[in-house]
Amino acid sequence: NLFWKSYGLASVVKSSDPGENPGSAVNFPLNVLVAEGLLEYGFKSEAADLISRLMQGITQSHLREGAFRYSYHSDKGTGMGERNALNGLAPVNLFLKTLGLQIVTPHEIILHGFNPYPWPVTVKYRGTTILCQKDKTTVIFSDGQTTTVSEEGTHKVSMDRSSGS
């Protein structure tokens, strides 16, 4: 695909000019909309791939420069444009939605399927730890209660507040 690049979808197809042209930039709002559309229409693995590429560019650029950029180079991942721009922030909500993780409260988690990303993901929120792997998800609540879900589908996981009281 001409647009599907190492760090996201390019704004336009690269021209023959070897310099930094606008076509080499990853437009974040557009990429996020495409990822949301992929997710909405059931293309979870493709959405996860696109989000992984975006996150890789964001983290590499942030580690190098200590700042978020307006956009990122689609082939190199280097930051482009304005520093500390809101446009360049990581799409955390979309990342979690693609992961199938909905945190209702620190004591109630809803899981939708398994981790589509190529690596294990650990999310920590107010004392609750969620370990998302390819074939199972483990939720460890702040009081130590642990639940592991190893079946596909949607699962509501809640902390039993009667234990330890």
What positions do the PLM features span?
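C-terminal capping/lid segments that line or modulate ligand- or cofactor-binding pockets
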Residues: 1, 21-130, 135-136
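Short, surface-exposed linear patches
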Residues: 2-6, 116, 153, 161-163
